């Protein structure tokens, strides 16, 4: 169990992609065909059944399926290549959306990528669910669109979301990976805008290493939800139950909650090259496995993906299937000592 949840194999391997990521293709779980199973939780259930046989009066607290919908807000302005803007006209026959992107600043309108943030929260509320929005505050780079949370049109959106009780978190930029100083600066700036002292979030591009837990702990963050593979959906940590990680290098528990990421829209569409219908089927299978072990189904869907008519529709289909499933409450889990 510790082998899976501590990501021991990633400490032992130097294999990484161009972004410094350990991929599913390199993992024991995918090579031996059990990445699709929460194997740590399954072992736990088997052990529970043995104990119940030995101690008939013993019953552990019941765990039920919960959902963690999260959204990395990578972009808030005009799409970098205009593909999405033109898509509004060609695919959806919505020329106004194209004008919104191209002329929005002059007309005082929010760009479609920023407007999609409100669509995300609206969809969640309509289905009795809750969403967490993870924001950046970084300069433009080869791998970051770059935006400033203090910009008036962005800050107004963030303030409105906070007033509506939407969870806001951090999405540290590409180059904060393995750079504690830069990470700390960004986290501090974002939390200042949020007027929050402790939040959670996810690293941009899923750039993660077991030592990333150390950096996040030092920055005072409450939880991380980066531990998922970019190239394949599944159970990277072998579990869908949030947990406090154990650092094999420091030989101690990390003061941080890990909420394992199970699936991401980009993984399905780009890395696995699945059609929207196939993506929905795979996501619901994953959610069902979480339900069996009483875990948390953690899904990442970017605001940009809602602008794609096919994947926007696929996301709504998943929400319909998950309708009124309780959200995972990380604050309650930490305060109660459940994790």
Residue ranges and their predicted role:
Residues 72, 170-172, 216, 299:
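A generic structural signal for nonpolar/compact residues at packed positions
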Residues 1-149, 241, 248-339:
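Terminal accessory/targeting
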Residues 75, 79, 100-101, 118-208, ...:
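Metal-dependent polysaccharide deacetylase catalytic core of the NodB/CE4 family, i.e.
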Residues 131-132, 169, 199, 222-226, ...:
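A local structural micro-motif
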Residues 174-252, 308-312:
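Catalytic domains of cell-wall/extracellular-matrix polysaccharide-remodeling enzymes
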Residues 23, 72, 133-134, 158-163, ...:
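Aromatic-residue detector
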Residues 123, 160, 164, 189, ...:
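Alpha-helical structural signal in soluble globular domains
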